[in-house]
């Protein structure tokens, strides 16, 4: 029974006040080992695969249809890989595979680990803003990210594999689907997200230290793009499970 609760058993809605997403590129061979057998990497030029770090201020997280005052607010950092999945019906779905999640609220850590497979951990995330520079830090883990939100004419990060920001937006997230996998039962859990008014804006990353990503020891990792989205109503449909066989 408890395992069924983790399969996103009901629809959920929330409001993203702002979401800063940093996407890192690596040779696809370096990320292949991090995803389950049912998924394939979503690549650029059949060479680069991507891991994203999303830092999201969220409010009003609650079962869909419940009044807003019953919702929870929290800060979330999600670590995910861009992937593809071919469904039983033959549909090719783009989405994300979650490696881990961090939050500043103990309640969110508990509920997140009851109702999802996203590996929530409570940390000491703090966000401050001074002179148009956003500083996101965790004194426990050593995470530190500084983002310049003032400039409107932002260049792609040095060594980015993308030719321009239009090309880079394909790997901005969030994507329509999130996948989890039970290798023992060979079941894939598919959660579909629905968003509105999604306009990602390029941002400049002044500096970044992200221990979770560094501890994966990914060779050839480079910052590929960075975006912010603001004021986004979002909801996730109830999760659905299907059996997987190699196809």
Residue ranges and their predicted role:
Residues 2, 117-247:
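Interaction-surface and assembly-scaffold signal
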Residues 2-6, 13:
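N-terminal intrinsically disordered, low-complexity segments enriched in P/E/S/T
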Residues 6, 74, 225:
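A domain-level signal for the structural core that forms small-molecule/cofactor-binding pockets
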Residues 11-18:
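Terminal, regulation- and interaction-focused segments at domain boundaries
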Residues 12, 29-79:
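Glycine/small-residue-rich interface belts in oligomeric ring/scaffold proteins
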Residues 27-41, 82-92, 243-245:
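Secondary-structure boundary elements
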Residues 60-141:
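Aromatic- and glycine-enriched beta-alpha-beta binding-site module
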